[in-house]
Amino acid sequence: MKRILLTLLTSLFVATASADEGMWLPSLIGGRIDDMRSKGFRLTAEDIYSVNKASMKDAVVLFNGGCTGEIVSSEGLLLTNHHCGYGAIQSHSSVEHDYLTHGFWARSRAEELPNKNLFVRILVRMEEVTDRIAAGEKPEELIRAAESEGTGYKASVEQMYYGNQQFLFVYEQFDDVRLVGAPPSSIGKFGGDTDNWIWPRHTGDFSVFRIYASPDNKPAAYSPDNVPYRPRRHFTVSTRGVKEGDFTMIYGFPGNTQEYILSDAVDYVVNRADPDKIAIRTGRLDLISAAQATDPALRIHYAAKHANIANAWKKWQGEQLGLTRTRNVAVKRDYERRFQAWADARPEYTGLLPMMKAEYARMLEPYYAYEITRETLGTLPIRYSDEERSADSFERCRPTEQALFRYAFAAYAERCPEAYRVPEFLDGVAAAGSTDAYADKVFEGLWHRTDTMAVARLDKAMKRMLGHISWMLGTTSLRNPTSKRLNELYTLYIKGLREWDTQRAFYPDANLTLRVAYGTVAGYEYADGEYHTPQTTLDGIIAKDNPEIYDYDIPQALRDLYASKDYGRWGVTIDGQRTVPVC
């Protein structure tokens, strides 16, 4: 059966799988290669990652600091998710040229659209530096030395296993990345927030960009003289397709996982943090959605903001559901009990878990206060930029922005534990008479502020409050859900787990560094008697199509195509019916 497969290395996490798990470091993938071959992999470890020759790593990019992309041509053509390119698409959209709604396709290189502050990074190499740092070398020195090796080089030192290992990552950064194409939102965001993070899915979640470089193929700032980047390696697009049982692999930059955290932390996430953060974001989304429904200019203005808020909002809902359904807290507590039984006979680990749990009891309340502050007051602008002020929609935004200020102040006052509220906030509310009145006062000061006026319209208490919040949200000890002491204990805990649980295949948590995941293509059983196949088709889109609901209103051309069944070489026959694969 024919399948359409854009690339197995896409950042879309389609329904793969067997019971395989893991996000493996590519430089160490040789240790997994036998298992990969047993599942159908036919290449070598060097085909995946190599410093000395072109390999797959040279075609996988970190897109704009938070997404994965893949190079699919010898002239720098790049695929990434639609939602990853959403901000760039929005930046070029207007009521007259509504690329968000109608899509965009450059018909020549001259029509490709440059994007301010958009960049991609390609991994040059990664190397373990644990011993070098233990011997006294400083991470900053390693970074400086690596960045001096080439044009546009960027580097970082990242911890694995809570500091048991440390790796240096060296990237080549390209800052001239141009928009080539994107489908209409009715394709690229089909299903909207309802279908996000779930399977089955019918979303054409892709956008197309091109990397440009200097004539000598080096990173360069935007210039009309730049030329398409010539990659060391690019992926070809296969139209042969896949079937259940085939080997499949994901190569990309997963954001963050916490595989080894204690049951106390999971309990906090499931029963306290996620419910409150979901509720707060629901209120913000309701305000923004109401504004978008009244004005096409506001719909475009708030499109990326709405999408950014909704992405984690929907993820947390699934996280809460999944962790509850799998009884993750109870499972972890049983695992910890068995570890403790082993640790009791080993002085190095005997009191480890009790100390970790005591540290959690000490720091979870202030961390909760930090999370609430970040989700409320931390979402508000410290200033409106000149670029925002010059936008046609700026004055149109005023009622919505003021409503968001009021909502943030009220949610903060309601949910942040009193002992951790910013003192200047309490003083300001008391002086103004209510949270709404104080929110209005702060909003008016920020709304009218310009570069020349600076903060002249903000009284001292308001400036202190904003400064305090900026400090709080920028403090590493508060941002990190593990205190310095707890992080040290986790370092020992992971060491102990690896000594005790010798049958477990350990892999480092995701931290936005390049990883490999692999398995075999399969569907899954969502509930008793409810099996979802790993492939969706156009029939599913038509079944969901509803012109009355924005997220499910497909283009008329797609309805016409379905009616005619004129699918050309992309058509397949499933159960005697002609259709076309989607995801």
Language-model features, listed with the residues they occupy:
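Terminal presequence/propeptide segments associated with secretion/organelle targeting
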Residues: 2-4, 8, 15-583
